[in-house]
Amino acid sequence: MNEANSAMSDARRATIERTTGETSVTLTLTIDGSGRADIQTGIGFLDHMLTLWAKHGLFDLTVRAHGDLHVDEHHTAEDVCICLGRALDQALGTRAGIVRTAHSFVPMDEALALVAVDLGGRPYCVMQAEFATPRVGQLGTDLIGHLFESIAFNGRFNLHAQVLYGRNDHHKIEALFKACGRALDAATRYDPRLGGTIPSTKGVL
């Protein structure tokens, strides 16, 4: 496996390149963006969800992924989310001055989702969601929890996600991705009251 990571010091931006025997992914994330997204993974529903994540989080996100979709979507979807988490971690730098913790409730028609995050450097993921169908488009619903876990663990943050209720699996997943974007938007913002200090009594994240 070959990985090359580069960060741009003049902005909270990172590019991650990941190449394995199964996939090739190039992903660029700008935290302080405007919600622009250009996603091409070969998995239409994943493209849609990441576009929503960027739009509602006001992140700029570009993804180019090529994977062994003749096998299934698992490797490609997983590696894209690994890269997304690593890009977020790298773009945040020391995390000095950020709000750090935030949450968001997002409805999508009959479905309601909650996502809470803590960018404190301790990776964890709790997902509570039940899906009635095995797939939405080209993406298996059994992968949804694993994708959020991949983002959280590689992004070094704590993520709790819950679908409180709903009937349509597309709506449930869409609400989750929107809520995740909005929670991360709030948590990554600078709080001027911190004066650029680390938001932890330990002095390091």
Curated annotation (Swiss-Prot):
Pfam families: IGPD. It is found in: Cytoplasm. Keywords: Amino-acid biosynthesis, Cytoplasm, Histidine biosynthesis, Lyase. Coiled coil: none annotated. PROSITE patterns: IGP_DEHYDRATASE_1 (PS00954), IGP_DEHYDRATASE_2 (PS00955). HAMAP family: HisB. This is Imidazoleglycerol-phosphate dehydratase.
